[in-house]
């Protein structure tokens, strides 16, 4: 059975399931940000345990295929090194899970932070959708909206 699971979850299949798996969390964040469902399942540790499991599985698969983990540190040497690393599907998938996790965490933080200022769900959905699609731009848009609700600029909240 373990071998069947291992053979089923190829890199392409893992990519499919990770992308499909985060969609319910994002839909809950966007449409039900104040619900207990959001509080218990999305803004908790739950989605990150699942994504960490996928990451650990990918590391295990990479280890079995004799992946050179030391080469990951070459990404700091230049843009050409990053291009070379991204040509490896294992590294690309590790990066993608990392990116998905950070975006989801940031979306959860935005929802929690917005509740302090009683922001409307509709207004909150705009930066969340942009965060899901573009990443940091959604956080910037939320921060700009937040300035109007908080009536001050604070870099420490």
Language model: regions and residue ranges:
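Hydrophobic transmembrane alpha-helical segments in integral membrane proteins
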Residues: 2-23
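Hydrophobic alpha-helical transmembrane segments of multi-pass membrane proteins
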Residues: 14, 94-101, 129
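N-terminal signal-anchor/start-transfer transmembrane helix
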Residues: 17-37
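Alpha-helical transmembrane segments of polytopic integral membrane proteins
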Residues: 24, 104-111
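Membrane-interface helix-boundary motifs at transmembrane edges
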Residues: 32-45, 115-119
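C-terminal TM-helix exit segments that contain a strictly Trp-centered aromatic cap at the helix terminus
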Residues: 55-66, 141
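Membrane-helix interface/capping segments
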Residues: 62-91, 101-104
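Hydrophobic, aromatic-rich membrane-embedded alpha-helical segments
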Residues: 124-148
